[in-house]
A protein has these predicted regions:
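Non-catalytic interaction-recognition regions
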Residues: 2-145, 152, 156-158, 163-639
Length: 639
């Protein structure tokens, strides 16, 4: 049984990150994979495939009224959900209510033949039609537990798929100016962007992680002016950069230049002169400022790279804006648009006719004084991403801050002007603000950077794991408050601690089982038949669809939410089901005979059941570790 990919392509711009889970699952990407879905695990995806096949069979048999094959929705829109009440079964479908009107039948009348066909499927214990036409499905224990064998066989790759394969996604994130340390907003993009890249790769995509250094233009000039002022002990310029890091870098420039035989403080500070390459300096420049710029910007680059490395974020490409000018790419991009009829001259300036492609106004790209507008580099950069020799992007994903919302129109217009499809070849994600809190009050000050909190400040306060997890677990469209006190605590209210503790607890169960001589070799998974067992099995079965959905929605926060739900289910299971025999406590020994015997049975499972539970325990451990790794967070074995 295979899926027709061409009928089920889900475009990114057709699914919003805030789509509710139940609705989004109807668009889940497993139906996009074009690969057979094994029914031996009877996962939600397998049930959807089975229900689709039954629908077509009922049409062929004339048992579905006026329904025809073309009226049956694709598999990804056939909802299979987890009932809130376990008494209603393991899974439920509303297929009969979806199709009843098209079939010209009452929902319950259409549900009956569906239920009869489902009841004959291997791995299904019982099927019941309930209410107006819901179909409740109960799996047999062995079928429900088959997911455990699948997890142990596939390991950390369980749930990975190839439905985003065949395309190269260029994911640009952080891209902070090299004028200071990474601030808290950039830190959020580092956590979200790297996690997103990992999730996309788990869905088969080829991902190019890219950092764009804005090392051209006025901000770099302001940075250099600030350094010169600091080097001379002068007040920072009104539009300059402040903070202890400015003093530090200024001194490093002085020391480095001195080692090279250059007395940087005695270079001319007046306008004019030439730069390091012998080119005339423009108005507002000076030899001294150019020397500071030339030496300080690489220092800032190095510091940013080190911060990213310490945050477990790596990039495939570190792209320098200045190279677009040096290599003539800006001129070539403008020439390309001119050939396409989207460039004109007016008032001594060169304009991009972006209104031809949906923007609210045309944009200047070469000012009347002959200098390039900032947007000129944006145009050249997108063209470079799409047509570079190494790993050209099929999809260019930009992760921008909240202050860039006004850029979307012009960026999408530029995409369309090059003959590409906005929302398809270019995707823009806008992130919201981060507030850092301590003792219930906002934290505004950094040791080095003045009135901002930096990536290094956050890591020093709570560690990499807590920092990354807390920033990645919230939808980037939503402002987030980072509570330093909470993240430093070892309590269940701390989400990263709660998930990591579930992994450490599972590892501890393994150690105790080994000490007790318990293994899961030859375990009979049909013995996983309690309500708590079933909840854990169902949670594991939902991981593949959730992972696929997170990739389609560009939503790594869904991985974190899944892990928290799985951890909660596991902790509950751990508290009621035993793997390793446990002696009764003194208060328990003093209970009446019947109560004491019930406790003894609960705390001392027979060997076969203990082996099955140990295997389930290991499956949970594997999935939690894999999920944490997608978020760049470690899975400790002891806590």
């Amino acid at each position: 049984m295979t899926s027709d990919r061409s009928d089920r392509t889900v475009r990114f711009d057709q699914i919003r990150p805030d789509t509710p889970v139940d609705a989004a699952v109807r668009l889940r990407a497993f139906a996009l994979s074009g690969r057979p879905v094994s029914l031996d695990t009877m996962s939600p995806e397998a049930l959807s495939e089975l229900i689709s096949a039954i629908a077509h069979d009922l049409v062929a048999q004339g048992k579905a009224g006026d329904l025809t094959d073309d009226l049956i929705p694709p598999v990804d829109k056939l909802t299979v959900m987890r009932p809130k009440d376990r008494a209603h079964g393991d899974w439920a479908s509303n297929i009969a209510m979806q199709l009843a009107k098209k079939a010209g039948m009452k929902p319950r009348d259409l549900a009956e033949p569906f239920a009869a066909a489902l009841a004959e499927a291997e791995g299904i214990e019982s099927v019941e039609v309930a209410g107006p036409g819901f179909i409740n499905i109960t799996l047999d224990s062995a079928s429900a537990a088959a997911v455990v064998d699948k997890v142990l066989a596939e390991g950390a790759a369980f749930g990975w798929n190839g439905h985003l394969g065949g395309e190269t996604l260029n994911l640009e994130f952080v891209s902070a100016n090299p004028t200071g340390p990474i601030h808290i907003g950039g830190t959020r993009w580092a956590a979200v962007g790297d996690s997103m890249a990992r999730v996309l790769e788990a869905n088969g995509a080829t991902v190019v992680r890219e950092y764009y250094f804005n090392d051209h233009g006025e901000q770099i000039n302001r940075f250099a002016k600030s350094l010169v002022a600091a080097a001379h002990g002068e007040e920072c310029p009104a539009d300059g950069y402040k903070g202890a890091y400015i003093d530090e870098i200024a001194q490093r420039v002085i020391d480095e230049a001195k080692a090279d035989g250059v007395d940087v403080l005695n270079l001319p500070r007046v306008d004019g002169g030439v730069d390091a390459d012998g080119n005339p300096l423009g108005e507002g420049d000076s030899e001294q400022r150019e020397e500071f710029r030339k030496r300080a910007v690489p220092m800032m680059f190095a510091e940013i790279r080190e911060s990213m490395k310490n945050f477990r974020v790596s990039f495939d490409v570190w792209f320098h804006e200045n190279s677009l000018y040096e290599d003539g790419e800006v001129e070539r991009a403008i020439a390309d648009l001119r050939e396409r009829g989207d460039i004109y001259e007016k008032d001594g300036a060169t304009w991009f006719a972006s209104t031809n492609h949906g923007d609210d106004k045309d944009r200047v790209i070469v000012k009347s004084d002959g200098n390039y507008a900032y947007f000129a580099a944006d145009i050249a950069y997108y063209r470079n991403k799409r047509h570079r020799e190494s790993n050209p992007a099929d999809v260019a994903i930009y992760m921008l801050g909240a202050d860039h919302h006004g850029y979307i129109g012009r960026m999408m217009a530029m995409c369309a002007a090059f003959g590409d499809e906005p929302g398809r070849n270019m995707q823009i994600l806008i992130g919201q603000l981060v507030n850092v809190m301590k003792d219930g009050k906002p934290v505004r000050m950094s040791k080095r950077a003045g009135n901002v909190v930096t990536i290094d400040d956050l890591v020093e306060a709570v560690g990499v794991d807590a920092a990354r997890y807390s920033l990645a677990r919230t939808d980037y469209n939503t402002p987030v408050d980072i509570d330093l006190d909470l993240l430093a605590s070892h309590t269940n209210e701390n989400p990263v601690y709660y998930v990591q503790y579930a992994h450490a607890r599972a590892c501890n169960v393994d150690r105790n089982a080994a000490d007790a001589g318990i293994t899961h070799e030859g375990a009979d998974l049909a013995l996983l038949d309690t309500e708590a067992d079933g909840e854990v099995l169902a949670a594991l079965a939902q991981w593949p669809a959730l992972l696929s959905l997170a990739g389609d929605l560009r939503a790594p926060h869904r991985v974190a939410h899944y892990l928290e739900d799985l951890a909660a289910t596991y902790h509950k299971w751990y508290n009621v089901e035993r793997v390793v025999p446990m002696a009764l406590t003194d208060p328990e020994e003093r209970q009446d005979d019947a109560a004491r015997e019930a406790l003894r049975i609960a705390k001392n499972p027979e060997p076969a059941r203990a082996a099955a539970r140990l295997k389930l325990n290991d499956a949970v451990r594997i999935v939690i570790a894999a999920g944490l790794d997608l978020l760049g967070v470690e899975a400790p074995e002891r806590m």
